[in-house]
Amino acid sequence: MYEYLHGLITAVYPDHVVVDVNGVGYLVNTANPYRYEVSATAVTIYVYQAVSDTAQTLYGFSDFAEKQLFLKLINVNGIGPKSALAILANPDHQGLMMAIKTNDTGFLTKFPGVGKKTAGQIVLDLQNKLDDLAPATDDNTLFTPEVAPTTTENPQLADALAALTALGYRETAVKKITAQLRQFNGQTTNDYLSEGLRLLTK
């Protein structure tokens, strides 16, 4: 079982990154792949390895606190790794924990794959189990901002929309916020993705 990987990001996709560790490329599913960039500088990604009869899957996190929150979420009945990643994609982890503590199921049902029953289960299982967990933060120190192109075809926006779909948000919901995102003055894919998540969960 792996605790973390330390290596080079060699590729970034809407739902995962590839981490090269001593010449071996690891496919790591992350809540926000565009937090990272292809770089010659090594990064550390905390990981959780899920093993099934058909596959071994790695899930990656920006810090230990985010990993701990993920582990708590997947222990809730009805929440799998993919749903947990979709929840963690919203960078406001402190707001997430506050929603759980205050029984704000309306906030929780805004995440893909979380209905009223599952939201209630999250509150029931975790309401009194988060006090020992420091809020995970959206660490952007590993990401170097890029200047968004001025053409109508914005690759950063396109990548962010693809990432939202990969997280499980319905295509109709993503389309509804696309016009607002086009008006958003984002610099990077991470900017557009964070704003998209804010719009989808407000």
Swiss-Prot record:
The keyword DNA repair applies. GO terms for molecular function: ATP binding; four-way junction DNA binding; four-way junction helicase activity. It is found in: Cytoplasm. GO terms for biological process: DNA recombination; DNA repair. One of its GO terms (cellular component) is cytoplasm. Keywords: Cytoplasm, DNA damage, DNA recombination, DNA repair, DNA-binding. Residues 152-202 are annotated as: Domain III. Residues 142-151 are annotated as: Flexible linker. InterPro entries: DNA_helicase_Holl-junc_RuvA_I, Hlx-hairpin-Hlx_DNA-bd_motif, NA-bd_OB-fold, RuvA, RuvA_2-like, RuvA_C, RuvA_C_sf. It comes from the Bacteria. Residues 63-141 are annotated as: Domain II. Residues 1-62 are annotated as: Domain I. Disulfide bonds: none annotated. The RuvA-RuvB-RuvC complex processes Holliday junction (HJ) DNA during genetic recombination and DNA repair, while the RuvA-RuvB complex plays an important role in the rescue of blocked DNA replication forks via replication fork reversal (RFR). RuvA specifically binds to HJ cruciform DNA, conferring on it an open structure. The RuvB hexamer acts as an ATP-dependent pump, pulling dsDNA into and through the RuvAB complex. HJ branch migration allows RuvC to scan DNA until it finds its consensus sequence, where it cleaves and resolves the cruciform DNA. Belongs to the RuvA family. NCBIfam families: ruvA. HAMAP family: DNA_HJ_migration_RuvA. Homotetramer. Forms an RuvA(8)-RuvB(12)-Holliday junction (HJ) complex. HJ DNA is sandwiched between 2 RuvA tetramers; dsDNA enters through RuvA and exits via RuvB. An RuvB hexamer assembles on each DNA strand where it exits the tetramer. Each RuvB hexamer is contacted by two RuvA subunits (via domain III) on 2 adjacent RuvB subunits; this complex drives branch migration. In the full resolvosome a probable DNA-RuvA(4)-RuvB(12)-RuvC(2) complex forms which resolves the HJ. Has three domains with a flexible linker between the domains II and III and assumes an 'L' shape. Domain III is highly mobile and contacts RuvB. This is Holliday junction branch migration complex subunit RuvA. The gene is ruvA.
